[in-house]
């Protein structure tokens, strides 16, 4: 018994397919590379932001314990030295994570109001860390309007004294 043909010619030649695969690869490979590099970039940005948050939290915790050194002292040199120690603590934490910031990028506010119902006048230590991060893969800057991203870490701890 002979099979019935459906009228569509069948060829087993792959000569025409080789060129199509090369064209598809030329289109898909750059898009895949951009997607992969973007994922690495985004992951590192997220890590850097988390490290900034942790550094701000460490500074706020340290500052909350040192509030009475500043508020209880009338000597401006003691107040300035205590603020410098708080900022140095944050900078040292970031240096341990291979992030370089200046002490001027750390903002300390030890009179930050915290709203707690039934407890008026509660103050906290608010630490802000500003950091400008450049991109890992500079070739992506054509896709992103700015070659640097501004990141910020914030933390508030209630003052203990």
PLM segments and residue spans:
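Hydrophobic transmembrane alpha-helices
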Residues: 35-36, 76
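Short, flexible active-site loop motifs that bind/organize anionic cofactors or intermediates
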Residues: 9, 42, 76
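Short, conserved structural patches
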Residues: 2-6, 49, 54, 58-161
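Aliphatic-rich helix starts adjacent to a transmembrane/signal segment
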Residues: 20-21, 27, 36-67
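Hydrophobic residues within membrane-embedded alpha helices
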Residues: 13-16, 24, 53, 149
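N-terminal leader/signal peptides at the extreme start of proteins
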Residues: 1-18
């Amino acid at each position: 018994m002979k099979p019935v043909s459906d009228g569509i010619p069948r060829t087993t030649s792959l000569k025409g397919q080789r060129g199509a695969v090369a064209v598809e690869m030329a289109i898909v490979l750059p898009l895949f590379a951009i997607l992969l590099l973007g994922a690495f970039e985004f992951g590192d940005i997220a890590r850097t932001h988390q490290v900034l948050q942790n550094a701000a939290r460490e500074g706020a915790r340290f500052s909350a314990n040192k509030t009475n050194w500043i508020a209880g002292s009338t000597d401006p040199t003691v107040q300035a030295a205590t603020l410098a120690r708080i900022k140095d603590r944050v900078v040292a934490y970031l240096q341990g994570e291979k992030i370089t910031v200046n002490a001027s990028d750390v903002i300390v506010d030890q009179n930050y109001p915290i709203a707690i119902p039934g407890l008026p006048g509660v103050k906290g230590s608010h630490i802000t860390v500003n950091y400008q991060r450049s991109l890992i893969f500079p070739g992506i800057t054509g896709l992103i309007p700015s070659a640097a991203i501004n990141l910020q870490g914030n933390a508030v701890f209630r003052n203990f004294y």
